[in-house]
Structures are given as C-alpha cells and as structure tokens.
Amino acid sequence: MMSTSRAVKSPACAARRRQWSADAPNRTATFLACRHGRRLGGGGGAPCSVRAEGSNTIGCLEAEAWGGAPALPGLRVAAPSPGDAFVVPSEQRVHEVVLRQAALAAAAPRTARIEPVPLDGGLKAAFHRCGEVCREYAKTFYLATQLMTPERRMAIWAIYVWCRRTDELVDGPNASHISALALDRWESRLEDIFAGRPYDMLDAALSDTVARFPVDIQPFRDMIEGMRMDLKKSRYRSFDELYLYCYYVAGTVGLMSVPVMGISPASRAATETVYKGALALGLANQLTNILRDVGEDARRGRIYLPQDELEMAGLSDADVLDGRVTDEWRGFMRGQIARARAFFRQAEEGATELNQESRWPVWSSLLLYRQILDEIEANDYDNFTRRAYVPKTKKLMALPKAYLRSLVVPSSSSQAESRRRYSTLT
C-alpha cells in the first residue's frame, strides 16, 4: 500500500496566493488560501472515503487515509428526465461547460510559464506514484508524456490517476458493490480536493495540480455523473443521449487536460476552438471504445448504440445480443465508424494548437485509437467475437508518426506549408 508518512503540503496550494481571474466561475480552481487536513491516527477511514464493502481499496488503487471534510453543493450537467417538457440538446448542454472552462483558461495568458516549485518529500512521492500508475496502465501515453515539462507531466499523471480511480468504481473488481451513495461520497471527496483538503497521497497530487493550473471542477463532476449513468442505464434511445454519456466519461478528460497541456503562444486559434478539439478527441475515443467492445458489452446486457439508428438499419436488440454479423450490421457499423472518424478530424484542429511539448501525447492517442477503427473494418465488422486491437508493431510505428505531426506549427501563415511538409511522412 502506498502512503506518505505525514501530511502532504503542496507549495502550490499552501504557499501560493494565486487568483487566475476575478471573474472566474464559482467553485473553480481559484485559490486565495488553502488548508490541509491532518492524517487520522490509526489509519482510520475518512467520512468521504469510497470503498466497496469488505475491501480496503478504491477501485484497483489503494492509498492510506488522510482526513476529510464536508462537501459543498454544486451544479451538475444532469441527464434529462423522460418527462421533461423541454429538453436542451446534449451538444448545447456540453457546449456551456466548454465555454466555462475556456473562459477560465483564457484568463491565464498563453505566454505565462508554469515555474518549477520545489516539492516536499510527501508530494514528490505522490506524483511519483501517479507516474507509476500511468506507466502500468497506459504505457504508450506514459512514454509520450516524457516530452512534456516536468510540471505539466506530473499534473497530467495526477489527472489520469483520478480518472482511472473514478472509472474503476463502476468498472473495476469491486463494481458490483458500488452504489449511487458511494459516488455521492466520491464527489464530496472531489470537492475537498479542489478546496485543498486531500484525503490520500493520490488526491494530494491532484489537489496540487488544480492549484497550479486553471482547471474547472465541472468536468470532474460530470465524469462522476457518467458513472452514475452507468449504474442505472444500459440503453440509449438516440445519439443525443449517447453523446451526453460519451462526454461524461471521456469528453471531460479533454477539458481537464488542456489547461495543463497549455495552448501554444503562437496559436491564433480561439481558446474555445482548442477546447472543442479536446472534447472531440474524448468523444472519438469513447465512440471507438464502444464500437470495439460491442460483443463484450452485449454479454453484460449493455448496448451503447443509438436505438433509433439500429431500428432504421433494420436491426434490433436481439441482433446485437445474439451477435449476428449481417449486411445490415455492416452497413450500420460503416455509419458509426464514419461518425467517429469525423470527431477525430475535428480533434486534429485542436491538437495542433497545443504547446509543442504537449502535442505528442495527444497525437499518439489520436492516431492509435483511430487505427482501432481500421481493425474493426479489417475484421469484417465482427466486433461480437473478435476484439479489434492494434498490434504492438503498429503502435510503435505510430509513435514517430505522432511525433512528426506534433511538429506542425499552430494556426499561422506558415501552417499550410508545415502541414504539407509532414503530410507525406505521416
């Protein structure tokens, strides 16, 4: 079990008095002062700890308790109820969150440098552990983060670990024991992280991260909302419903990450455009996951496909649950793959505008996930009995291609020339 020997005091949280903008939205990472809780004697659990019954782990990652605090109420981009008289389309609802985060990030100058801050032993160990987790579960992404500055790299690791722990709550070994109440407690714990009161060492790394960077809490809340949706929903009537789910569980990651990765000072793109690209990459990745895992999800009684589009293609739940690869299924899958690729194309626009040292991880993710769609096609659209995966050799070949794409300069007068230069190589 990984733990520190004393309370983690983040220089960014405890020493800095940083306010990104006087107009920053409420409950964002706008810190004037922070307090840290002390470790509970005897290793007792905090009120906001989230554990499955009979287990000392949170998902698959275990860390020792530090303490907790009451949560503050917050808004949530909740899924519409079936009886709502007027339902705002999911894309519009998500766009409001994008605008909120973009406005917060725009208040911090793109030319501002994230200066190195000495870390005490406890916080250094916390970030090191986050790096270990990232290396274990996302080897390719971990490798790509090595080009980033240490401050940005460690912050991305901290965000990755929090997202993984959150996902493990409903998709990990203890998922059958997780309830909506447990997710409520996890959200309370999130509030404490943003308030500078981490519960364990992994929380401390994220608490330090949100104190250093203009990160909005809303995407984190929304990811937890996606976990709630997974507990109670196994069908999606339309792509509008599926879009909201994909935003919750994956699009949020892009919105969390851009403030850390940073937008290139040379970029002429609007901040909102970059965030839309990050959102699109998250949506594309999740849609790809869904198309890859159709058979696996069906065996769990879940269908993450638009019901109305299945019906228009002449397909039913029974066809999916029985795993029938028919001409109708192939036609349906072609349309779903085309949609995912459209999101990948939109993601490219945002990836080019990031800081140069941050582009390689993003391009690596984009190119690798897009290859999964190629593998589904190569399997003749049989994603029931054959799981599409990218062979290791292709993954390794994608990394230098991603690196070359990362060298394309942001939107400027020389962008077209730069793209032509590298297009023949990638």
Swiss-Prot record:
PROSITE patterns: SQUALEN_PHYTOEN_SYN_1 (PS01044), SQUALEN_PHYTOEN_SYN_2 (PS01045). GO terms for molecular function: 15-cis-phytoene synthase activity; geranylgeranyl diphosphate synthase activity; squalene synthase [NAD(P)H] activity. Pfam families: SQS_PSY. It comes from the Eukaryota. The keyword Phosphoprotein does not apply. One of its GO terms (biological process) is carotenoid biosynthetic process. Its EC number is 2.5.1.32. Expressed in roots and endosperm. Its main location: plastid. Signal peptide: none annotated. It catalyses: 2 (2E,6E,10E)-geranylgeranyl diphosphate = 15-cis-phytoene + 2 diphosphate. Induction: Induced by drought stress, salt stress and abscisic acid (ABA) in roots. It is found in: Plastid, Chloroplast, Plastoglobule. Residues 1-52 form a transit peptide. Keywords: Carotenoid biosynthesis, Chloroplast, Isoprene biosynthesis, Plastid, Transferase, Transit peptide. SUPFAM superfamilies: Terpenoid synthases. Gene3D superfamilies: Farnesyl Diphosphate Synthase. InterPro entries: Isoprenoid_synthase_dom_sf, Squ/phyt_synthse, Squalene/phytoene_synthase_CS, Trans_IPPS_bact-type, Trans_IPPS_HH. GO terms for cellular component: plastoglobule. Catalyzes the conversion of geranylgeranyl diphosphate to phytoene. Mediates the first committed step in carotenoid biosynthesis. May play a role in regulating carotenoid flux in response to abiotic stress in roots. May control flux to carotenoid precursors that are required for abiotic stress-induced abscisic acid (ABA) formation in roots. Belongs to the phytoene/squalene synthase family. This is Phytoene synthase 3, chloroplastic. It comes from Zea mays (Maize). The lineage of its organism: Eukaryota, Viridiplantae, Streptophyta, Embryophyta, Tracheophyta. The gene is PSY3.
